[in-house]
Amino acid sequence: VGAAVYCEDGRIFAGANVENASYGLTVCAERVAILRAVSEGVRRIQAMVVVTRDGGTPCGACRQVLAEFADEDVWVWCYGEDKQEGQEYRLSDLLPNAFSLRSRVLQEEEITLGGT
């Protein structure tokens, strides 16, 4: 699996799947690309491209990590190894009602304001 993210400042960061004998420690290409960008100071991701054997979409963990650094309407393009055309998705379609620290803070403010 390979992935790349396009960032708000125009930079592109690529990532590859990093396998581990202990499967739970494997890191997906999408998260590698996102974390490379974040480690270089990027805070907002504008788009993501993923290439898998069959054109599959990012796993739930990768979707959640992307949601922390992208708006819900960010495009995610998924391609298979041998296909010329990919599928395009909005993050909000892949992860509706995503949890984020921002959404949690807003919920807490609403609860506080609603109770006064």
Where on the chain are the PLM-derived regions?
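Short beta-strand scaffold segments in enzyme catalytic cores
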Residues: 1-7
